[in-house]
Amino acid sequence: MKEYALEIATKAKAVLPKLSSLNPAVKNSILIRVSQLLKENKELIQKENEKDIEFAKSINLSKAMIDRLKVGEKQINGMIKILEDVAKLKDPVGEITSMWTVDNGLKIGRMRVPLGVIFIIYESRPNVTIEAASLCFKSSNAVILRGGKEAIHTNKILSDLFRQAIREHVEGLEDAVCFVDKREREIVTELLQLEGLVDVAIPRGGESLIKAVSETAKISVIKHYKGVCSIYVDNEADLKKAYNIVYNAKVQRPSVCNAIENLVIHKDLLQDFWPKMAMVLLESDVELRCDEDSYEILQNKDFDSFKSKIKKATEKDYYEEFLDLILAVKTVNSLEEAMQFIEKYGSKHSDAIITENHTKAMRFLQEVDSAAVYVNASTRFTDGNEFGLGAEMGISTDKIHARGPMALRELTIEKFIIFGNGQLRENVGIPKELKEKLQID
């Protein structure tokens, strides 16, 4: 396994010089060609996907996981759209983001360049193969793809078609997209040790996967941790906004990382806002896990038919990423308490305040330490496309390099570029005597 990992990483590293200087128009042509190959090979892709579905059933994968694994007409069309959209994005490679002149006449600037070789580990959804490969390729990064063992046939045909498109346009560049076509976990461990060959790892999946990668890796890891997101409804909130925002953030799509898991309510809203909000959520099949105060408010005949969905919260509930129609509820006495709660239980992903008080809103924005912080809007907008950034690799909760949606630009890094005209530090050059001796003009 060590030899296999070393071989694939060496191949990916070798194409970086050619890839980094590839004309943006050529990159876009390749992406469009991949989209054409997906259209032309829909039946083949679905045939390979059927093999994965059978394997998934044989290892008793859950129905939800099998649903995520399925690739039909809709999913293939979605991949085609991703490729077409990425082709339209502005290429960040080579962009000079700033330039200035210092006292000695040096012109100093910053230029965006690729990260290098990116190792992406992901689970189930085969569309990630196309999404990750297209973003890495457009940003001139070589990528090593390692999908879940249950999707190996689908992922392989998708990566093979991508490599075919590259081969058709540029000789010797197909290793810009490498696919790990073996199921052994040891390969992942070996690739995570290859400092100098692999530049960064990006795990996309559950918390256990991300922790395992972070603890094993010798290379840099950009983490996309779980989304324990909260909304705080302040006592100066516009309640009409609050009802809809909370509903949207929990109910619209509960299985994603930017849906809320905790609802924090100011105690002044317990009598009026909370019973109505609770009824909206319960009628929408949401299970409520309440603290003492919010639980007591719901102990009347209006809620008798929902008794099975009204429970007392445990400490563990507030840390939990449910990814389901379950919501933990906490009441607080102040903005300070709300922010303390979010700091303790949140995952620094996306959090929101609903208030009409500008001072409170600005304080929340400044003090809540999350990748995305909202005022009077649903947390469900934390997404590359929704932010106007285009397709993304995920939502980074790290504080180094990239934070929030990791779109095309976030797959590059800045380096310094310096233009001079013979400047010397402290004007120290070759001594006159040595110049004369060696006859240097």
From Swiss-Prot:
<dbReference type="InterPro" id="IPR015590">
    <property type="entry name" value="Aldehyde_DH_dom"/>
</dbReference>
<dbReference type="InterPro" id="IPR000965">
    <property type="entry name" value="GPR_dom"/>
</dbReference>
<dbReference type="InterPro" id="IPR016162">
    <property type="entry name" value="Ald_DH_N"/>
</dbReference>
<keyword id="KW-0028">Amino-acid biosynthesis</keyword>
<dbReference type="GO" id="GO:0004350">
    <property type="term" value="F:glutamate-5-semialdehyde dehydrogenase activity"/>
</dbReference>
<dbReference type="GO" id="GO:0005737">
    <property type="term" value="C:cytoplasm"/>
</dbReference>
<keyword id="KW-0560">Oxidoreductase</keyword>
<keyword id="KW-0521">NADP</keyword>
<dbReference type="Pfam" id="PF00171">
    <property type="entry name" value="Aldedh"/>
</dbReference>
<keyword id="KW-0641">Proline biosynthesis</keyword>
<dbReference type="GO" id="GO:0055129">
    <property type="term" value="P:L-proline biosynthetic process"/>
</dbReference>
<dbReference type="GO" id="GO:0050661">
    <property type="term" value="F:NADP binding"/>
</dbReference>
<keyword id="KW-0963">Cytoplasm</keyword>
<dbReference type="InterPro" id="IPR020593">
    <property type="entry name" value="G-glutamylP_reductase_CS"/>
</dbReference>
<protein>
    <recommendedName>
        <fullName>Gamma-glutamyl phosphate reductase</fullName>
        <ecNumber>1.2.1.41</ecNumber>
    </recommendedName>
</protein>
<dbReference type="InterPro" id="IPR016161">
    <property type="entry name" value="Ald_DH/histidinol_DH"/>
</dbReference>
<dbReference type="InterPro" id="IPR012134">
    <property type="entry name" value="Glu-5-SA_DH"/>
</dbReference>
<comment type="pathway">
    <text>Amino-acid biosynthesis; L-proline biosynthesis; L-glutamate 5-semialdehyde from L-glutamate: step 2/2.</text>
</comment>
<dbReference type="InterPro" id="IPR016163">
    <property type="entry name" value="Ald_DH_C"/>
</dbReference>
<comment type="similarity">
    <text>Belongs to the gamma-glutamyl phosphate reductase family.</text>
</comment>
<comment type="function">
    <text>Catalyzes the NADPH-dependent reduction of L-glutamate 5-phosphate into L-glutamate 5-semialdehyde and phosphate. The product spontaneously undergoes cyclization to form 1-pyrroline-5-carboxylate.</text>
</comment>
